[in-house]
Amino acid sequence: DFVRERDLLEDRGFRAEQMGLRSEVIESLFRVILWASRDHQASLGAEVSKETASKTVAIIGGNGGMGKVMTRLFSEADNNIIISDLDTTITNVEAASQADVVVIAVPIEKTIDVIQEVGPHCKAGSLLMDVTSTKSAPVKAMRDYSKGTSVIGTHPLFGPSVHSLQGQRIAIVCLRDEHGWDEWLTTILHGRG
């Protein structure tokens, strides 16, 4: 609760000044403690039901920066993970054809090409999503190159260096969802932070 944290920081800063200490130093120390506490709470995760979490998720570009973040996110929620990347034996198409959820986590300049490659091979009823900062072209490509799938574009408002998703924001653009994937994804994201 950010209001309680703010009040705590103000109180500790005030007490530090009363003791002749620099309030900003004490506040900085308490910010680190509060961050560590939030991070630990996020690592415990909110309870996500097995029905919600038991999916096979293919991370296309899973060995890259954002791919690793997505792998951690979905694996911590007890999903089965398939990773395809330049250095894996499984191909993008093989991974996509086996998955309930296909996450495109490749560099921006490769996103459209990869969507064109895997979109036609996604299972009917599956979710095709991306984690690209641009939304218009990837969402349009996912719509055009996949049939019978739900299409959700996401834009994580953070980079691959984050330690946890606690307090992070992700913009979601749900273009097509006839299978309840938007609720599933939102549940997973809230459960992780």
Model-derived features: where do they sit?
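N-terminal Rossmann-fold NAD(P) dinucleotide-binding loop
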Residues: 67-68
